[in-house]
C-alpha cells in the first residue's frame, strides 16, 4: 500500500461482470478530474491465445493443468512487481491482450495476441487494475498487500457460469460444450486462486438472480437487472465509512440484510458503487 501512489484493484472471474465495475470507476474518475494509470489484468497472461490452446491441450493429455486462473498460465511475479513499483515510484509497465477485432484495430495487432510491453503514463493520480488476480495471495506472491482499495465482483456461481458461456458463444464463437469444458478445466485453479481473494477484499459486489438458474448449462437467457438484486458487502468498515441510512434513502428498493450488507436492485448497482466509492477514492487522494 502507498499513500503517495495508491492502487485500486477490481478482481473477479471470467463472466463475473468486472467490466461493469470498471465503467463505474471510469465515470468517477472523469467526474472528479482524476488521471488514472489503467492496467487490464489479461496483459499478465503468460501465452497468447494460439500458444495457450496448444499448451493446455498438451497439459490435458499429460494430466496436468494450464489455465488462465493459475500460476502456469500467468506472470504472477510480473503483476506483483508492477504493483510494487507503482506504489513506490508511480511508474510501471503494461501491455494488451487482444480479445477481438475492435481491439485488434485499435492496437494494430491480431486477435489473440499480446502486444509489446510499454511504460505506464507519467504523473498519474492512481493505478486502476481490473482483472482476475487483483487480490492474489500464494505461498510466493502477495499482490493484495500492495492494493489500497480492493473490490470483489462475484455473482453467484450459476449466474457467473451463464454469463461466461454466453460471452464465449457471442465473442469467441464457442459452442456451449466448448465453454462448459473450459469451465471444468479451470475448476481447481478457480477454487485455489480466484475465490480466496474475496475474503481479502474491502467490498464485494454479488449479483443474485430472482429467477430459476438451476441449470446454467441448459439456458442462454441471462437474467435482466429487473430479475436480479446486487448484494453489497462492506467487509472493511474501518477503511470504508458508509452512511447506510443515506444509501437506503438514495437507492429505492434497497434493504439492509445485515449490519454491513445492503441489497439493492441490480439496476442501481452502478449508482450504488458511485455513492460508496467516490468518497473513498477522494480520501485516498487527499492522503497523498
Regions from the language model: what does each represent?
Residues 136-141:
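Conserved ATPase-coupling elements of RecA-like P-loop NTPase cores
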Residues 113-122, 143, 157-288:
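C-terminal accessory "lid"/substrate-recognition subdomains
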Residues 34-40, 44-103:
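Conserved nucleotide-sensing/catalytic segment adjacent to the nucleotide-binding pocket
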Residues 2-8, 124:
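Pre-Walker A (Motif I) flank of P-loop NTPase domains
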Residues 20-21, 25:
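Hydrophobic positions on the alpha1 helix immediately C-terminal to the Walker A/P-loop
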Residues 16-17:
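Conserved glycine(s) of the Walker
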Amino acid at each position: 500500500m502507498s499513500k503517495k501512489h495508491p492502487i485500486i484493484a477490481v478482481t473477479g472471474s471470467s463472466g463475473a461482470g468486472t467490466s461493469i465495475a470498471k465503467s463505474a470507476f471510469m465515470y468517477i474518475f472523469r467526474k472528479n478530474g482524476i488521471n488514472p494509470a489503467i492496467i487490464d489484468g489479461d496483459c499478465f497472461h503468460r501465452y497468447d491465445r494460439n500458444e495457450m490452446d496448444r499448451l493446455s491441450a498438451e497439459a490435458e493429455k499429460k494430466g496436468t493443468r494450464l489455465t488462465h486462473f493459475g500460476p502456469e498460465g500467468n506472470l504472477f511475479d510480473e503483476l506483483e512487481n508492477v504493483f510494487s513499483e507503482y506504489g513506490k515510484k508511480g511508474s510501471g509497465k503494461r501491455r494488451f491482450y487482444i480479445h477481438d477485432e475492435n481491439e485488434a484495430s485499435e492496437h494494430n495487432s491480431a486477435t489473440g495476441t499480446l502486444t509489446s510491453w510499454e511504460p505506464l503514463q507519467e504523473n498519474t493520480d492512481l493505478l486502476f487494475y481490473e482483472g482476475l488476480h487483483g487480490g492474489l495471495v500464494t505461498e510466493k506472491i502477495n499482490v493484495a498487500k500492495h492494493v489500497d482499495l480492493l473490490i470483489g465482483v462475484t455473482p453467484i456461481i450459476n449466474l457467473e457460469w451463464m454469463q461466461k458461456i454466453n460471452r464465449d458463444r457471442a465473442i469467441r464463437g464457442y459452442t456451449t460444450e466448448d465453454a462448459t469444458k473450459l469451465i471444468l478445466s479451470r475448476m481447481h485453479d478457480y477454487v485455489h486462486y480466484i475465490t480466496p481473494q474475496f475474503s481479502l477484499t474491502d467490498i464485494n459486489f454479488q449479483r443474485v438472480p430472482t429467477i430459476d438458474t438451476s441449470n446454467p448449462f441448459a439456458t442462454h437467457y441471462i437474467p435482466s437487472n429487473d430479475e436480479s438484486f446486487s448484494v453489497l458487502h462492506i467487509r472493511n468498515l474501518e477503511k470504508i465509512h458508509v452512511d447506510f441510512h443515506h444509501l437506503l434513502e438514495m437507492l429505492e428498493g434497497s434493504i439492509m440484510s445485515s449490519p454491513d450488507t445492503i441489497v439493492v436492485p441490480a439496476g442501481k448497482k452502478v449508482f450504488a458503487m458511485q455513492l460508496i466509492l467516490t468518497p473513498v477514492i477522494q480520501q485516498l487522494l487527499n492522503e497523498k
